[in-house]
A protein has these predicted regions:
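Active-site-proximal, substrate-binding regions of enzyme catalytic domains
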Residues: 2-113, 121-190
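H-loop/switch region of ABC-family ATPase nucleotide-binding domains
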Residues: 116
């Protein structure tokens, strides 16, 4: 079964778009990318040039990038459009919409690769029955380098940082979560 890449927040989209051709690196392993409606909204709501580039990239890859509608995502988007929500209420909405989509079966079966911007991970127990692999942005880049897809993770990380994404940490975390003790570790690299 093919691993699906899930973004629990929009941070990786902003980091990868900061580098020329960077968004295509998200598809480089040949794995489908799944976003929830709220993650897409979070990345494109401003209407800035960067947001429009992300929106255009998503639209240009309908067979590789899938946007899943969620109940919470639709409610949050409506309240943000109506300007009835507070900024503090946005905390962790992306993560919660991803787990809503998983719980409702809207994403299908795993294994899943959760791509996080930083080294703050959800408690592995939260993944439940799903075989999951958690990886940081830099861990993803290192995986691409080790697979021969890119020549240097360090160069791309440096470009991200020099193009406004200074907060992307050079932390390599790449860890599997088994759905049960008997299951094999998940893998994601080609």
């Amino acid at each position: 079964m093919r691993t699906k890449v899930l973004l629990p927040d929009s941070g990786p989209l902003f980091s990868f778009v900061s580098v020329s051709g960077g968004l295509d690196l998200l598809l480089a392993p040949g794995l489908p990318l799944v976003l929830t409606d709220y993650i897409e909204w979070e990345a494109t709501r401003s209407g800035s040039a960067t947001a429009l580039e992300i929106k255009s990239w998503i639209a240009a890859h309908p067979n590789k990038v899938r946007v899943v509608e969620t109940e919470l995502g639709q409610a949050r988007i409506a309240s943000e459009v109506a300007k009835t929500s507070k900024k503090v209420e946005r905390r962790n909405v992306g993560e919660v919409t991803v787990f809503e989509a998983l719980a409702n079966g809207d994403v299908g079966d795993g294994p899943f690769l959760f791509l996080f911007e930083e080294d703050k991970f959800v408690d592995p127990g939260f993944y439940g029955r799903h075989p999951v692999h958690s990886v940081t942005t830099f861990g993803f880049l290192v995986g691409l380098e080790r697979s021969g897809i890119i020549p240097s993770a360090d160069v791309i990380l440096g470009a991200m940082r020099s193009n406004g994404r200074e907060g992307v940490k050079a932390v390599i975390l790449d860890r599997p979560h088994r759905a049960s003790r008997e299951d094999a570790d998940t893998t994601w690299r080609p």
